[in-house]
A protein has these predicted regions:
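Conserved phosphate-handling catalytic cores of large alpha/beta enzymes
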Residues: 1-10
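A broad detector of the eukaryotic-type serine/threonine protein kinase catalytic domain
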Residues: 1-2, 26, 49
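NAD(P)-dependent Rossmann-like dehydrogenase/reductase catalytic/cofactor-binding core
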Residues: 9-12, 19-31, 54, 59-160
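Structural/interface elements that position substrates and couple domains in central-metabolism enzymes
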Residues: 20, 37, 41-47
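AAA+ ATPase "lid" subdomain C-terminal helix
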Residues: 42, 52-54
């Protein structure tokens, strides 16, 4: 996040350096609470908690929707590139076709609820049925190995 007094040459130079060392830098044009990743993750998490709380799906089915649906695509491309490819006429076509639906969905969640202890306890109970608390370190290590394998794969592929 460049400050107002940051020299204009610093951000592109920092981006080049980060790319050179194998990182994928994100430029945040101005300060925003939570930065970019946490805000996007927060939107998805808030909807996941609400869908579970309102009885639309189980914790497992919500996780599967993300890991085998959105996450499957999003590990290679972001939301805008995804929708650009999901309509014959690209992003503008997608926005015309589905913008009203997504706007209606967003309006329905204009007053998000906090994640309360009761709800967290219910989610916790479903998760513990799938994975005992003492198995978290082993599952985390499994996740990390999978992430490293995915990273190796992505690093060997072209973006085009």
């Amino acid at each position: 996040v460049p400050a107002p007094w940051t020299d204009a040459a610093i951000v592109p130079a920092a981006r080049r350096f980060m790319n050179m060392v194998g990182q994928v830098p994100i430029v945040v044009n101005r300060e925003v609470e939570g930065f970019i990743l946490n805000r996007l993750q927060g939107a998805l998490l808030n909807e996941a908690w609400a869908l579970f709380e309102e009885g639309y799906a189980s914790v497992e089915d919500i996780d599967l929707t993300v890991s085998h649906g959105l996450g499957f695509r999003w590990c290679f491309m972001g939301p805008f590139e995804t929708i650009d490819l999901n309509a014959p006429g690209g992003v503008a076509d997608y926005a015309r076709r589905l913008g009203p639906l997504y706007h209606s969905i967003a309006k329905a969640r204009s007053n998000p609820k906090p994640w309360n202890e009761d709800l967290a306890g219910r989610v916790e109970a479903e998760r513990r049925q799938k994975l005992a608390i003492d198995q978290l370190p082993e599952r985390s290590a499994w996740r990390d190995r999978r992430l490293m394998a995915l990273l190796r794969h992505k690093n060997t592929q072209s973006d085009t």
